[in-house]
Amino acid sequence: MTLKDKKAIKKILRIAKKHPDLYSKAEVMYAKIIKKRLKRMKVTLVQATPKPEENMAYIARVSNPSNQDNENYSGLLKYCIKHNHWSVFEQAFMTLEIETTRAIAAQILRHRSFTFQEFSQRYAKSNELGKIQLPDLRRQDLKNRQNSIDDLDPFTKQKLEAQMITLFSSAQSLYNQMIEYGVAKECARMVLPMCTPTRIYMTGSCRSWIHYIQLRSAHGTQKEHMDIANACKSL
């Protein structure tokens, strides 16, 4: 979704509040759903190696002690990338806080060069991270089983989203009821959908982050995961 789309949604909600007769209830409801989605994914910097570029360049010049304090490190790091001297980029680290869904978290956790800490549904109630949000619906790419195309009919979307609202509300109510009856959280969580929100702390070296961003911002990555990779890149 582009910045222009985001501004259009905010404008619809602002005008609808002042002039409720201009938009149908369905249009306003749909705009609110999209607005919630914009807040669902969030990437925040927690900590990083101080002066990472300077630190990596200093270490890279370990065999040239007389030149280790050279402040011109930009060219050196570009040279290391060009010639695949990746060990240099293992000397700086970064930790990010990522808010996403359980479905996307499962994909992120497959990157084994990172260390993770994830919100535990066994220890805490799942709704502590907010309500279950509706996922974006896209058409299946018939030529690539792991790809989707964002051209699904809007009326089909609205019809299916109405059913999802009912389904998710029912799942959340059942989950709450199970907790009230004393069912263990590790058992009650089984009724929750994959788009249940979660939070991950992801720590890795600069080398790992470069590889992750290159891989997950490329074509073929699920859109929700691609958005996270691009957000990581912007940091």
List the model feature ranges, each with a label.
Residues 1-235:
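Family-specific signature for flavin-dependent thymidylate synthase
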